[in-house]
């Protein structure tokens, strides 16, 4: 069997890191590490958002939540500032770790830096890779987390969150989001947000 490519070496190492997540999720009758499942959902959406995505975008999308459990949201103050600081720190950590994994697998420092930038979602308006990461993250949120999340958040705040999420998505991601299967309650929130946005 030929040696693995840098891409496959990096993906294998990233998935090994994902698999270390102690949190579990039940999926199709199997118990999986939560982060490995999340990474799989991100990659699955990428195939629908971007036609023939390149290796660097695939690595960025796969790593967006890398080792997120190691820095819990509860370690930061409540409220918007605490949330934004936590999210920024998570993106920085995930980008740095992914860059190290990539270089160890044989990628150049410039390719590793480009992926780290995509993970931090820098330049959404000018970097298609960063936009792909954002699109996949928004779609995974709407598909897998929104129904439960919507029960924990005050209605008007939830409407604003949906509007902000929608505003960050590309036209293709919005099209895919409208095709999602949702509960009646979740669908009503999305429709209200879009009609009043």
Describe the function of each predicted region:
Residues 34, 38, 49-58, 86, ...:
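Generic, well-ordered alpha-helical segments
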Residues 43, 58-59, 112-120, 191:
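Short, well-structured alpha-helical segments
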Residues 12, 96, 100, 140-141:
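Generic structural signal for well-ordered, non-membrane alpha-helices
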Residues 74-117:
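Helix-adjacent hinge/juxtasegments
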Residues 55-78, 94, 98, 117-123, ...:
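His-Asp-centered metal-binding catalytic motifs of divalent-metal-dependent phosphohydrolases/nucleases
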Residues 26-30, 80-87, 127-128:
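A ubiquitous short alpha-helical element
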Residues 2-9, 16, 29-36, 40, ...:
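Divalent metal-dependent phosphate-bond-processing catalytic cores, especially two-metal-ion Mg2+/Mn2+ enzymes
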Residues 18-27:
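Short domain-edge segments at the starts or junctions of modular domains/repeats
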